[in-house]
Amino acid sequence: TNIEQQYELQRNEWSVHYTTSWDENLLAGDGGDSTSVAKAEDGKWIYLFKPVVNTLKSTRLVNMKNHNYRLEPNVHFSPDNKWIIFRANFEGEENVYAVEI
């Protein structure tokens, strides 16, 4: 659509990567830590964002505190927009996870 919209976001909700849902009504972010581009002190979360007026209302979906952000989670929506799929290394090995939204 080539329409640009800016939204206000709290500092700790910054993510390294964002993606939009297939219907373009929601966004997801993969969080980050103080050493990543996001530079968030308490941002180790998979977030769901819903645009409301000029801000993004966030919902924390997955606590990523045991994830090493050298592996980027790279969140994606499932084609039916019911799940967010991401990768993580919670237990030392890389795995693919899904969280229902």
State each model region's role:
Residues 8-55:
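Loop/turn-rich, solvent-exposed surfaces of beta-rich toroidal or solenoidal domains
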Residues 8-19, 55-77:
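Conserved blade-ending motifs and adjacent loop-strand segments that build the rim/top face
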Residues 1-2, 20, 29, 77, ...:
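Conserved hydrophobic/aromatic "anchor" residues
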Residues 1, 36-48, 92-100:
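Structural motif
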Residues 72-101:
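Blade-level signature of beta-propeller repeat domains, shared across WD40, Kelch, NHL, RCC1
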Residues 47-60, 77-86:
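A short, hydrophobic secondary-structure junction motif
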Residues 30-32, 50, 62-65, 88, ...:
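Active-site proximal loops enriched in glycine and acidic residues that flank catalytic Cys/His/Asp
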